[in-house]
Curated annotation (Swiss-Prot):
Residues 383-397, 591-614 have a biased composition (Low complexity). Glycans are attached at residue 29. It comes from Homo sapiens. This is Voltage-dependent calcium channel beta subunit-associated regulatory protein. Residues 67-705 are cytoplasmic. The gene is CBARP. GO terms for molecular function: transmembrane transporter binding. GO terms for cellular component: growth cone; plasma membrane; secretory granule; synaptic vesicle membrane.
C-alpha cells in the first residue's frame, strides 16, 4: 500500500511525540536524584590545605621550642660571663637589709620599655643624696688589665664618708646587700639581688648601721644631714624629720634618722612624718614609689637643694669646665669626678633655697647639736663657701645670740649691725633678709659699692658691712672689731647654712693676712649684743691700683684705649685674633704707636729725663717714670720739653741759613730745663714758652703708678 501524505504527517507527529517524551524523561532523571560522589579534583585541594596547616603548626612549635632553649642557654652563658668579668656600666646602690623586701632573683621585666621601669624602680629605692662616683679598680687597686676599668659605683655622699671612716674604724655591722641594675642591652632587664660574694672582694665591708639602732657619734657628728659632713649640718634626728620632711632621705643614706622614717615619704613639703609612723613593711614598695614621684613633682626642687641628685652638667661658671673649655679626653674623668663630688650648686632655673633657710630660722634655739669642728681646721671639700644665715649662738662676747628663742621666719635674720654710728648707715642694712644665694650676693655687692674702696688695703676695712659709708670715720677701722680668727663657738645650738659663691675660690671668712699688723684695739662694748658684728664681711672688690695693674698686664698694650672704638669692639668680638696680635706684639716696643708723633724730633739732651713714650724698662709703669725719676713739684708744667731744631746743616752759624733764637729765649729754656732736672727748687716756676715746648701725648689710662 502506497504511503499517502496523511500517513506521513501522522508518522512525523508520532516520532516527535516519542522524542519529546524521551527528552523529558532523561531531564527528569538528571535533576531528580542527587549526585552520589563529589568531584575528585575538589577533594585533592582540601587534603593539601590540611597537610600544609599541620606542617606549618609543627614547624612553629619546634621553632619556638628551639628559641626558648637558646634563650635559656644564653641566659646561663651571660650569667657565667658576668660572674667572671663584670659588666662595665652598672649603677650600684646600697640598701639596708630591713628596709626593702628582697626581690625575686629570677624576676625578668618583659615589657619593651624596660629602661623606664628599671629606672623608676631604681629611683624609688635609691636615696636622693648627692652622688659620689668612683671606680672599683681604683678603689681596690687591682686593675687586672688596662682596658678593664672594672665596675663603676655611684654612692651617696653619706655612704662615701662612711666608707672612708669604715676603713679607719672597725665597725661591727652586718654585710651589705648590693642591688645591681644593668643597662637594657639584651631584651630583658636583669635585676639580680644576689649579694655577689665573688665579684666584689670587699663586699663584707659594712657601710650602714643595722636598722635597729641610730648612728653613733663616733665617726659622724649627728648634726650633719649628710653623714660625715659637719659643715652642712641640718638638724637632729627627729626634729629634722618632723620639720622638713621633704629633705629626708629615702633609704640608702646613713643619716641619723630612724629606719622607719627612711621608708616613709611625705606627700608634699607640708606634711610631717613622725619617726615611727610607717615601719618598713613589705607592701610599701609601690606606695613608696608613688609617693616618691609625687613628692618629686610636688616639692619645689625635687627635694630641697642639698638632697638632690647632682646633674652632671658642666656649666661655664664651674671651674672644672672653665679650666679647659672643650675638655680633652684625659680630663673627662676628672671633670666627672669633680662634678659628682662637689657640693650641689644652684642651677639657673632652680627655685630659691627657701625651705631650708626657713627651717633653720624656725628651728632657732629649739634644736641643739654638738658643735662642729673649728671652722678653719679642716676646710670643706667644696672650694669656697660663704656663711649666709646663722641661727642663735651662745651668750658670750664671741658668739652672742642673734635673736630670741621664738623667732619665726627669715625676716628676723638680720645681718650684724655695727655700733651706734653704723645703726643709721642707710636703708641697705636695715632690711636685709637673704632669700637665696643671689640676694646675698646682691647685698654683698651693695656693701662693696657703698664702701670707700681706696681707704686702705684690699682685705682690711674697705668693706665691713658698709662701715665707712654711714659713719664719718672715713677709712678708719671698724669701732668694734671681732676676734682675730673666729673662735669655735662655745654653744652647740647653732645651724649653719653654707652657700657656695660661684666665684670659685671665695675665701673662708676670717681676718685678712694684713690685719695682724693692726694694733689690737680695746673697744668699749655697745649697748646691746645685737649691735656686735658677728664676723667681718669679706671684701670681694679690689682697689683701683690692683685693678689697673691687672688690666695692664692682662693686655700687654698700654695704648689699647687709644684705638678707635670699632677696632676695639672687633678685637673683643674675636679674642683669638686679639691673642695672635698680642703674641707677635708683646716682645716689641710698647711705645711704637707714639713714634709718629716724635718722628721728626731728635733725642733730647743726655741729661734730660726720658720721654714718657720711650720703651718701658722692667719695673717701669705705663704712665710715668718710676720712683727714682719722679716728676717735678706741683707747680711744674707736666709736659716734657723737647728742643725743636730748624732743618739745616750742622755748620749753621757760618752759613746764614738758620735763625738763632735770642739770648732771653735761651735763658728761659735753660731755666725750664734746670727746673725739670732739679725738682726741689720750687721758688718761682718758669712758664715755658709755647713755641719751644712740645707736649708728648699721654695715654688717658690714669692708673696710678
Amino acid at each position: 500500500m502506497q504511503p499517502t501524505a496523511t500517513m506521513a504527517t501522522a508518522a512525523t507527529t508520532t516520532t516527535t511525540t516519542t522524542a519529546t517524551v524521551a527528552l523529558t524523561t532523561s531531564w527528569d532523571n538528571a535533576t531528580g536524584r542527587p549526585t552520589a560522589e563529589p568531584d575528585p579534583i575538589l577533594d585533592n585541594y582540601v587534603l593539601l590545605v590540611v597537610v600544609m596547616s599541620l606542617f606549618v603548626g609543627g614547624t612553629l612549635v619546634v621553632l619556638s621550642g628551639v628559641l626558648l632553649l637558646c634563650k635559656r642557654c644564653w641566659d646561663v652563658h651571660q650569667r657565667l660571663n658576668r660572674a667572671m668579668e663584670e659588666a662595665e656600666k652598672t649603677t650600684t646602690t646600697y640598701l639596708d637589709n630591713g628596709t626593702h623586701p628582697a626581690q625575686d632573683p629570677d624576676f625578668r621585666g618583659e615589657d619593651p620599655e624596660c629602661q623606664d621601669a628599671e629606672t623608676e624602680r631604681f629611683l624609688s629605692t635609691s636615696s636622693t643624696g648627692r652622688r659620689v662616683s668612683f671606680n672599683e679598680a681604683a678603689l681596690f687597686e687591682q686593675s687586672r688589665k688596662t682596658q678593664d676599668k672594672g665596675r663603676r659605683y655611684t654612692l651617696t655622699e653619706g655612704d662615701f664618708h662612711h666608707l672612708k671612716n669604715a676603713r679607719l674604724t672597725h665597725l661591727h655591722l652586718p654585710p651589705l646587700k648590693i642591688v645591681t641594675i644593668h643597662e637594657c642591652d639584651s631584651g630583658e632587664a636583669s635585676s639580680a639581688t644576689t649579694p655577689h660574694p665573688a665579684t666584689s672582694p670587699k663586699a663584707t665591708l659594712a657601710i650602714f648601721q643595722p636598722p635597729g639602732k641610730a648612728l653613733t657619734g663616733r665617726s659622724v657628728g649627728p648634726s650633719s644631714a649628710l653623714p660625715g659632713d659637719p659643715y652642712n649640718s641640718a638638724a637632729g634626728a627627729t626634729d629634722f624629720a618632723e620639720i622638713s620632711p621633704s629633705a629626708s632621705s629615702d633609704s640608702g643614706e646613713g643619716t641619723s634618722l630612724d629606719a622607719g622614717t627612711r621608708s616613709t615619704k611625705a606627700g608634699g613639703p607640708g606634711a610631717a612624718a613622725g619617726p615611727g609612723e610607717a615601719g618598713p613593711g613589705s607592701g610599701a614598695g609601690t606606695v613608696l614609689q608613688f609617693l616618691t614621684r609625687l613628692r618629686r613633682h610636688a616639692s619645689l626642687d625635687g627635694a630641697s637643694p642639698y638632697f638632690k641628685v647632682k646633674k652632671w652638667k658642666l656649666e661655664p661658671s664651674q671651674r672644672a669646665a672653665s679650666l679647659d673649655t672643650r675638655g680633652s679626653p684625659k680630663r673627662h674623668h676628672f671633670q666627672r669626678q669633680r662634678a659628682a663630688s662637689e657640693s650641689t650648686e644652684q642651677e639657673e632655673g632652680d627655685a630659691p633655697q627657701e625651705d631650708f633657710i626657713q627651717y633653720i630660722a624656725r628651728a632657732g634655739d629649739a634644736v641643739a647639736f654638738p658643735h662642729p669642728r673649728p671652722f678653719l681646721a679642716s676646710p670643706p671639700p667644696a672650694l669656697g663657701r660663704l656663711e649666709a644665715a646663722e641661727a642663735a649662738g651662745g651668750a658670750s662676747p664671741d658668739s652672742p645670740p642673734e635673736r630670741g628663742a621664738g623667732s619665726a621666719g627669715p625676716e628676723q635674720q638680720q645681718p650684724p649691725l655695727e655700733p651706734d654710728a653704723e645703726r643709721d648707715a642707710g636703708p641697705e642694712q636695715a632690711q636685709t633678709s637673704y632669700r637665696d644665694l643671689w640676694s646675698l650676693r646682691a647685698s654683698l655687692e651693695l656693701h662693696a659699692a657703698a664702701s670707700d674702696h681706696s681707704s686702705s688695703g684690699n682685705d682690711r676695712d674697705s668693706v665691713r658691712s658698709g662701715d665707712s659709708s654711714g659713719s664719718g670715720s672715713g677709712g678708719a677701722a671698724p669701732a668694734f672689731p671681732p676676734p682675730s680668727p673666729p673662735a669655735p663657738r662655745p654653744k652647740d645650738g647653732e645651724a649653719r647654712r653654707l652657700l657656695q659663691m660661684d666665684s670659685g675660690y671665695a675665701s673662708i671668712e676670717g681676718r685678712g693676712a694684713g690685719d695682724d699688723t693692726e694694733p689690737p684695739a680695746a673697744p668699749a662694748r655697745p649697748r646691746s649684743p645685737r649691735a656686735w658684728p658677728r664676723r667681718p664681711r669679706r671684701d670681694y672688690s679690689i682697689d683701683e691700683k690692683t685693678d689697673a695693674l691687672f688690666h695692664e698686664f692682662l693686655r700687654h698694650d698700654p695704648h689699647f684705649d687709644d684705638t678707635p672704638a670699632a677696632a676695639r669692639h672687633r678685637a673683643r668680638a674675636h679674642p683669638h685674633a686679639r691673642k695672635q696680635w698680642q703674641r707677635g706684639r708683646q716682645h716689641s716696643d710698647p711705645g711704637a704707636r707714639a713714634a709718629p708723633a716724635l718722628a721728626g724730633t731728635p733725642a733730647p739732651p743726655a741729661g734730660a729725663a726720658r720721654p714718657a713714650r720711650a720703651p718701658l724698662r722692667r719695673g717701669d709703669s705705663v704712665d710715668g717714670p718710676p720712683d727714682g725719676r719722679t716728676l717735678g713739684g706741683a707747680g711744674d708744667d707736666p709736659a716734657i720739653p723737647v728742643i725743636e731744631e730748624e732743618p739745616g746743616g750742622g755748620g749753621c752759624p757760618g752759613s746764614g741759613l738758620c735763625v738763632l733764637p735770642s739770648g732771653s729765649v735761651l735763658d728761659k729754656l735753660a731755666a725750664g730745663l734746670d727746673e725739670r732736672l732739679f725738682p726741689p727748687r720750687l721758688a718761682e716756676p718758669v712758664v715755658a714758652t709755647p713755641a719751644l715746648v712740645a707736649a708728648a701725648p699721654t695715654s688717658p689710662d690714669h692708673s696710678p703708678a
